Amino acid sequence: MNDLFNAAQHQLDALGLRCPEPVMMVRKSVRRMNDGETLLIIADDPATTRDIPSFCEFMDHTLIASQTESTPYQYLIKKGL
């Protein structure tokens, strides 16, 4: 799965940020991307384990992969479905 994360076209470092900042930054980053592009999010806020999947579902983006077993958490999302 590590190769999957390494293949992301964009990356967002949200380490040290707390809710709601990580999701606000994800939204801003995704807005600048084209449909189908991928974003790797690296975060350590436990709230992201709930917030990022919910954001993807609500905004119609695809959560391709996530690693939430240990920090830093990693999320790979694709803009659009």
Curated annotation (Swiss-Prot):
Keywords on record: Cytoplasm
Gene Ontology process terms (BP): tRNA wobble position uridine thiolation
Location(s) in or outside the cell: Cytoplasm
Disulfide bonds listed in the record: none
Sample GO molecular function, one term: sulfur carrier activity
Taxonomy, superkingdom: Bacteria
Entry GO terms, CC: cytoplasm
InterPro entries according to UniProt: Sulphur_carrier_TusA, TusA-like, TusA-like_sf
Active site: C19
HAMAP family: Thiourid_synth_A (MF_00413)
Family in the record: Belongs to the sulfur carrier protein TusA family.
Function: Sulfur carrier protein which probably makes part of a sulfur-relay system.
Name of the protein this chain belongs to: Sulfur carrier protein TusA
Protein's organism: Shewanella pealeana (strain ATCC 700345 / ANG-SQ1)
